[in-house]
Each structure stands twice: as C-alpha cells, then as structure tokens.
Amino acid sequence: MTNKHNEKENALSGFIAAAGTILTISYPVLALSTGTRASVRLLRGDTTYLPDGLSALAATFYIIATIGLIYRNPKGWYLSVSVLFLETICTLIVGGLSFVYPDVIGNTAWRHFGADYGYFPLVQPLLGLAWFFHPQTLAIYNVNPRWLAYFRK
C-alpha cells in the first residue's frame, strides 16, 4: 500500500515539476507573441480597439504571471494566483461572447477560448492554478493559506 502511494506521489511530483517548467517557458512566449501582435495592431491604428485592447490585457496578465513564477515568495504566489483566476474568468467570458458577438469581440487572444493560440489561453491558467495549489509548490513559495485547510479535510 505504501509503495503504491509513493509511486503515485512521485508520478505527481514529476508532473508538477514538468508543469512548472512548461509554465515558466510558455508564459513569457505567449506574453511576447500576444503583446507584439496587440502592439503592432494598436500602433497601426487600422483596427478596432476592443479586440486588441483585450489582447494587450491578456499579454499583461501573462507578464504578471511570469513575474510570479520567477519570484518564489508569498507575494509572488498571491500575485500569480490572482492573475490566473482573472485570466481564467476573462478567457471564459470573452471566449463565450466571441461565439455570440463575433463582430464585437473580433480577433482577440481569448476569442473562441484561445483557438488562435492552440487553446493555451484556456488551458494554461488552469494548469497554472493546479501547479500553484499543489503542496510542493505551496512549500516552495512558503505559502499556507488558512482557507485551503478546509479543502484538505
């Protein structure tokens, strides 16, 4: 019984380590691509501002999440978790609205839940939240939210 538990724990630890590496690489790349695209389109001025403004907001979220991934302290943890929750909410809202009002939403990073970016804008914050709430990550960031104890019972 203990060996199976240890095997599962080791497999999960490997997954969590891999997820952290993926996030550390993918967030800056997505910030660069989304931010560059939004900046070029906004500076050109031949576009509607809402879609590109939303893409710029997404790029800002990605940059903030990257900062939280780099600074492994409680402030970095709370910063990243907050922005990942916001990013998830924005992806779901804008992604849903892009099917109902495609002309208004336009071509944002969150359109159709991030279809233009391989659905990374939808999957990435969920993976990030799973990573940030894993016990190993909480220990790395030296975070022990009291409210989290209610979910561990």
Where are these regions (language model features)?
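Topology signature of small-to-medium multi-pass alpha-helical membrane proteins
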Residues: 2-153
